[in-house]
Design a protein with these regions (language model features):
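Short active-site-adjacent helix-start/loop capping segments
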Residues: 44-45, 72-74
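General beta-strand structural signal in soluble alpha/beta enzymes
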Residues: 64-65, 119
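Acidic/polar residues in short coil/turn loops that connect beta-strands
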Residues: 67-68, 85
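Short, conserved interaction/coordination micro-motifs, predominantly
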Residues: 6-25, 30-34, 141-167
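Gly/Ser/Thr-rich beta-alpha loop segments that engage phosphate groups in nucleotides
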Residues: 42, 68, 77
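Aspartic protease core domain of the pepsin/retropepsin superfamily
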Residues: 73-76, 80-167
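Aspartyl protease active-site motif detector
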Residues: 14-64, 90-106, 145
Length: 167
Protein backbone atom coordinates (compact mmCIF):
# COMPACT_ATOMS: atom_id res chain seq x y z
CA UNK A 1 0.00 0.00 0.00
CA UNK A 2 1.23 3.47 -0.86
CA UNK A 3 0.84 5.93 2.01
CA UNK A 4 1.37 9.63 1.49
CA UNK A 5 1.24 12.38 4.06
CA UNK A 6 1.68 15.25 1.63
CA UNK A 7 -1.08 17.56 0.42
CA UNK A 8 -2.51 17.83 3.90
CA UNK A 9 -6.14 18.80 4.12
CA UNK A 10 -8.64 19.24 6.90
CA UNK A 11 -12.16 18.18 5.97
CA UNK A 12 -15.41 18.27 7.87
CA UNK A 13 -18.17 16.19 6.33
CA UNK A 14 -21.83 15.87 7.20
CA UNK A 15 -23.50 12.58 6.23
CA UNK A 16 -27.08 13.09 7.43
CA UNK A 17 -28.43 9.98 5.71
CA UNK A 18 -25.68 7.62 6.87
CA UNK A 19 -25.64 5.98 10.29
CA UNK A 20 -22.41 5.02 12.02
CA UNK A 21 -23.93 1.84 13.42
CA UNK A 22 -26.06 -0.66 11.51
CA UNK A 23 -29.11 -2.50 12.75
CA UNK A 24 -28.56 -6.10 13.88
CA UNK A 25 -30.12 -7.40 10.65
CA UNK A 26 -27.83 -5.21 8.53
CA UNK A 27 -24.73 -6.22 10.55
CA UNK A 28 -25.37 -9.85 9.64
CA UNK A 29 -25.47 -8.94 5.94
CA UNK A 30 -22.20 -6.97 5.96
CA UNK A 31 -18.80 -8.62 5.60
CA UNK A 32 -15.27 -7.42 4.88
CA UNK A 33 -15.71 -7.64 1.09
CA UNK A 34 -19.26 -6.31 1.08
CA UNK A 35 -19.91 -2.72 0.06
CA UNK A 36 -23.20 -0.86 0.41
CA UNK A 37 -24.18 1.04 -2.74
CA UNK A 38 -25.77 4.01 -1.03
CA UNK A 39 -28.03 6.63 -2.63
CA UNK A 40 -27.95 8.76 0.53
CA UNK A 41 -24.21 8.90 1.20
CA UNK A 42 -22.35 11.91 -0.16
CA UNK A 43 -18.90 10.27 -0.05
CA UNK A 44 -17.22 6.88 -0.46
CA UNK A 45 -16.12 5.65 2.99
CA UNK A 46 -14.62 2.64 4.72
CA UNK A 47 -13.36 1.71 8.15
CA UNK A 48 -10.89 -0.83 6.79
CA UNK A 49 -7.37 0.52 6.26
CA UNK A 50 -6.25 -2.70 4.58
CA UNK A 51 -8.43 -2.12 1.48
CA UNK A 52 -6.47 0.92 0.29
CA UNK A 53 -4.05 0.68 -2.62
CA UNK A 54 -3.12 4.32 -1.94
CA UNK A 55 -3.87 6.32 1.20
CA UNK A 56 -3.06 9.97 1.91
CA UNK A 57 -2.93 10.19 5.70
CA UNK A 58 -2.48 13.95 5.43
CA UNK A 59 -6.22 14.27 4.90
CA UNK A 60 -7.85 14.51 8.32
CA UNK A 61 -10.97 15.94 9.88
CA UNK A 62 -14.35 14.77 11.08
CA UNK A 63 -17.58 13.40 9.74
CA UNK A 64 -20.97 13.84 11.39
CA UNK A 65 -23.42 11.01 10.79
CA UNK A 66 -27.21 10.97 10.81
CA UNK A 67 -27.34 9.62 14.36
CA UNK A 68 -25.44 12.71 15.60
CA UNK A 69 -22.13 10.94 16.16
CA UNK A 70 -18.96 12.76 15.09
CA UNK A 71 -15.87 10.66 14.32
CA UNK A 72 -12.39 11.20 12.94
CA UNK A 73 -11.33 10.97 9.31
CA UNK A 74 -7.79 9.60 9.08
CA UNK A 75 -7.11 9.67 5.35
CA UNK A 76 -8.41 9.62 1.82
CA UNK A 77 -7.34 7.35 -0.98
CA UNK A 78 -7.95 4.79 -3.68
CA UNK A 79 -9.31 1.25 -3.44
CA UNK A 80 -8.48 -1.20 -6.22
CA UNK A 81 -11.04 -3.88 -7.06
CA UNK A 82 -10.51 -7.12 -8.99
CA UNK A 83 -13.31 -7.76 -11.48
CA UNK A 84 -14.51 -11.22 -12.47
CA UNK A 85 -12.98 -10.77 -15.95
CA UNK A 86 -9.54 -10.14 -14.44
CA UNK A 87 -9.56 -6.37 -14.91
CA UNK A 88 -8.90 -3.96 -12.05
CA UNK A 89 -11.09 -0.95 -11.31
CA UNK A 90 -10.21 2.04 -9.13
CA UNK A 91 -12.51 3.72 -6.65
CA UNK A 92 -10.98 7.13 -5.96
CA UNK A 93 -11.82 9.59 -3.21
CA UNK A 94 -12.54 7.03 -0.47
CA UNK A 95 -12.37 8.40 3.07
CA UNK A 96 -10.76 6.26 5.77
CA UNK A 97 -12.91 6.45 8.91
CA UNK A 98 -11.64 3.84 11.41
CA UNK A 99 -14.87 3.79 13.47
CA UNK A 100 -17.00 2.92 10.45
CA UNK A 101 -18.16 -0.70 10.36
CA UNK A 102 -19.44 -0.57 6.78
CA UNK A 103 -17.86 -0.04 3.37
CA UNK A 104 -19.89 2.57 1.49
CA UNK A 105 -19.94 3.51 -2.18
CA UNK A 106 -21.72 6.83 -2.72
CA UNK A 107 -23.88 6.52 -5.82
CA UNK A 108 -24.12 10.31 -5.94
CA UNK A 109 -20.33 10.52 -6.09
CA UNK A 110 -20.29 7.85 -8.82
CA UNK A 111 -22.81 9.89 -10.83
CA UNK A 112 -20.70 13.03 -10.30
CA UNK A 113 -17.66 11.16 -11.64
CA UNK A 114 -19.53 10.28 -14.86
CA UNK A 115 -20.77 6.78 -14.05
CA UNK A 116 -24.37 5.88 -14.84
CA UNK A 117 -26.58 4.62 -12.02
CA UNK A 118 -29.91 3.02 -12.94
CA UNK A 119 -32.36 1.71 -10.35
CA UNK A 120 -35.54 0.06 -11.56
CA UNK A 121 -37.82 -2.66 -10.17
CA UNK A 122 -35.46 -3.55 -7.33
CA UNK A 123 -32.38 -3.87 -9.53
CA UNK A 124 -29.47 -1.42 -9.46
CA UNK A 125 -27.24 -1.29 -12.51
CA UNK A 126 -23.94 0.59 -12.45
CA UNK A 127 -22.24 1.51 -15.73
CA UNK A 128 -18.70 2.82 -16.28
CA UNK A 129 -17.71 5.89 -18.30
CA UNK A 130 -17.94 3.89 -21.56
CA UNK A 131 -21.42 2.67 -20.49
CA UNK A 132 -20.24 -0.89 -19.96
CA UNK A 133 -22.14 -2.70 -17.19
CA UNK A 134 -19.99 -2.86 -14.04
CA UNK A 135 -22.52 -4.31 -11.61
CA UNK A 136 -26.08 -5.56 -11.43
CA UNK A 137 -27.34 -5.75 -7.85
CA UNK A 138 -30.70 -6.88 -6.48
CA UNK A 139 -32.24 -4.93 -3.61
CA UNK A 140 -32.01 -6.75 -0.28
CA UNK A 141 -34.91 -7.35 2.11
CA UNK A 142 -33.65 -4.38 4.14
CA UNK A 143 -33.96 -2.21 1.00
CA UNK A 144 -30.20 -1.83 0.64
CA UNK A 145 -27.98 -2.72 -2.30
CA UNK A 146 -25.00 -4.87 -1.27
CA UNK A 147 -22.14 -5.68 -3.62
CA UNK A 148 -19.40 -8.17 -2.80
CA UNK A 149 -16.13 -6.97 -4.31
CA UNK A 150 -12.68 -8.50 -4.19
CA UNK A 151 -9.90 -6.15 -3.22
CA UNK A 152 -6.92 -6.27 -5.59
CA UNK A 153 -3.45 -5.89 -4.16
CA UNK A 154 -1.36 -3.43 -6.13
CA UNK A 155 1.63 -5.07 -7.78
CA UNK A 156 4.95 -3.40 -8.46
CA UNK A 157 6.87 -5.12 -11.23
CA UNK A 158 10.57 -4.48 -11.72
CA UNK A 159 13.14 -5.91 -14.04
CA UNK A 160 16.88 -6.07 -13.53
CA UNK A 161 19.18 -6.43 -16.49
CA UNK A 162 22.65 -7.69 -15.70
CA UNK A 163 25.90 -7.33 -17.60
CA UNK A 164 25.46 -10.63 -19.41
CA UNK A 165 24.69 -9.99 -23.08
CA UNK A 166 22.00 -11.96 -24.88
CA UNK A 167 23.51 -14.47 -27.31
Amino acid sequence: MYIAADAEACVHLVERKVLLHLSEEEKEAVGPHRWVLDTGAMNHMTGSRSVFAELNTGVAGTVKFGDGSVVAIEGKGTVLFACKNGEHRRLDGVYYIPCLTTNIVSLGQMDEDGFKVDIESGILRLYDLQRQLLAKVHRSASRLYFLDMNIAAPVCLTMHVGDVAWR
